[in-house]
Regions:
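Conserved catalytic alpha/beta core of Sir2/sirtuin-type deacylases, generalized to analogous enzyme cores
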Residues: 1-294
């Protein structure tokens, strides 16, 4: 498909069109990616965020959260204390200490009384903190609030980690290492636990797939109605989960509209340009404008 920037209307007219589409929608499918959280102030590519949230690593020369994650991506015997020195802090500060971000607050106000379903690739817990009905959220990429066995010895067991995270964080020394006695271990087999994130084929996905059928059924049951695909901050890290399916579904549904809001990545295939509204701007600013008109 040929890409287009969809610049057929002014910003104000696009906001008006979005409001009308949302108000008249029989169903709204919302796709939330990393750009949504970035719009709320936590961008994994922003050096300023490293200085604010992870000064210990900024002092070591790291320029982004992505760069730090790359340095501690895999747990090994050699790096286990430093690995958890970072990941315990990351989960503590991103998942547990970060409050509900403004873009999510605004989204709640916009869609709370609508017929909606959410798919998110984020693991930061912001959709949970938003208070959305958990039966209307499909989050297949994992969650920072649970661990899984590194093997894994079970394909359906994950473990809540808040207390484990607290113990590790409290034990971190000046070398950014945890006390070895707090390394989390699998209660079933005794091997190491790791964050439950979709990194490879060892990911324990079953606990996150319970709403998959509901998500599919919601889409299919509304395909011939006025269905809106509202995509917020979805880029090309995992486009096969939200971005590409939303394009394909918009193309195949006679009354569908794709609303794509994303700073720097608000293009659509030319084939669905007439069925799309794209805004290349800060997501939260757009949501504020939408909220003013609803």
């Amino acid at each position: 498909m040929t890409k287009s920037f969809n610049k057929y209307k002014s910003y104000e007219n696009k906001i008006n069109d979005i409001v009308k589409k949302i108000e008249n929608a029989d169903a709204i499918v919302i796709g939330i990616g990393a750009g949504m959280t970035a719009s709320g102030g936590i961008s994994y590519m922003d050096e300023k965020i490293v200085k604010e949230l992870f000064p210990e690593y900024a002092n070591l020369g790291f320029k982004s959260i992505v760069e730090i994650q790359s340095a501690f991506w895999k747990l090994s015997e050699e790096n286990k204390l430093s690995y958890w020195g970072y990941w315990a802090r990351h989960i503590d500060r991103i998942r547990y200490k970060t409050k509900l971000l403004e873009p999510y607050k605004n989204l709640v106000e916009i869609i709370s009384n609508k017929n909606y379903f959410i798919c998110t690739t984020n693991a930061d817990g912001q959709t949970q903190k938003s208070g959305f009905n958990k039966d209307k959220v499909f989050a297949p990429q994992g969650n920072y609030d649970v661990f899984q066995c590194i093997v894994p010895c079970s394909r359906d067991e994950v473990y809540l980690n808040e207390n484990m995270i607290k113990n590790m964080v409290d034990s971190i020394n000046e070398k950014n290492q945890i006390d070895e006695k707090f390394i989390p271990k699998c209660p079933k087999c005794g091997n190491y636990l790791i964050p439950n994130l979709r990194c490879d084929d060892k990911f324990v996905e079953k606990p996150h797939m319970y709403n998959l059928d509901k998500y599919r059924d919601f889409i299919m049951s509304n395909m011939n109605k006025n269905i809106v695909f509202l995509e917020l901050g979805v880029g090309f890290n995992t486009p096969g989960i939200i971005r590409f399916p939303f394009e394909q579904l918009t193309d195949s549904s006679p009354n569908a509209t794709l609303i794509r809001i994303n700073k720097g990545m608000a293009t659509v295939p030319k084939e669905i340009e007439s069925k799309s509204i794209c805004i290349d701007d800060d997501i939260n600013e757009v949501l504020i404008q939408i909220l003013k008109m609803i």
